[in-house]
């Protein structure tokens, strides 16, 4: 289970953390019009890797939850468009994504189309989506960067206050 309290702690920690950024891997054919910057926080492959140097013990313990498959800080520059897509099966298990918005410059110009319906974010309020199953696209049409922590969890994980 991932609690709202856990997500709030991740949000508060993320707001005061400076993340070392790198360019997200480019997917063949491209999935967006601009470079997205990321800082990985947790990865699961042959072994579990957590970027403990960036974290307090409390945050490390939250990310140690085996229901969390992957986590990253993501920065979408102004004018970024993420084209319509479903996320691929990149883990051994099906997953859903917890989006934790850190900085949303403008809810009118920063949004997601989820199955054709407009969804907006509020900073610090998480939303959960089965990104493998539904076509979605994202927009930052504002003049400032939009920032999130994205947390991929096993599909059957209970996420408190799941949308």
Sequence positions of predicted segments:
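Intrinsic disorder/low-complexity detector
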Residues: 35, 59, 87-89, 138, ...
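Surface-exposed beta-strand edges and flanking loops
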Residues: 40, 52, 78, 113-115, ...
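Intrinsically disordered, low-complexity peptide-like regions
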Residues: 31, 83-85, 134, 138
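Catalytic core of non-heme Fe(II) oxygenases with the double-stranded beta-helix
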Residues: 57-130
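Structured loops at beta-to-helix junctions and adjacent beta-edge loops in soluble globular domains
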Residues: 13, 30, 38-41, 76, ...
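Catalytic core of Fe(II)/2-oxoglutarate
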Residues: 109-163
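Non-heme Fe(II)/2-oxoglutarate
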Residues: 1-65
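Generic structural hydrophobic/aromatic packing signal, biased to beta-strands
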Residues: 38, 71-73, 138, 149
């Amino acid at each position: 289970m991932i609690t709202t309290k856990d997500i709030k702690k991740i949000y508060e920690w993320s707001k005061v953390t400076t993340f070392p950024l790198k360019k997200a891997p480019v997917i063949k054919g491209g999935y967006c019009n601009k470079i997205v910057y990321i800082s990985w926080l947790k990865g699961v492959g042959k072994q579990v890797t957590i970027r403990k140097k960036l974290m307090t013990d409390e945050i490390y313990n939250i990310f140690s939850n085996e229901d969390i498959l992957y986590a990253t800080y993501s920065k979408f520059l102004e004018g970024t468009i993420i084209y319509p897509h479903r996320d691929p099966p990149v883990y051994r298990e099906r997953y859903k994504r917890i989006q934790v918005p850190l900085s949303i410059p403008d809810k009118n110009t920063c949004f997601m189309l989820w199955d054709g319906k407009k969804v907006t974010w509020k900073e610090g309020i998480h939303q959960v989506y089965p990104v493998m199953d539904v076509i979605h696209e994202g927009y930052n049409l504002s003049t400032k960067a939009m920032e999130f922590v994205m947390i991929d969890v096993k599909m059957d994980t209970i996420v408190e206050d799941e949308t």
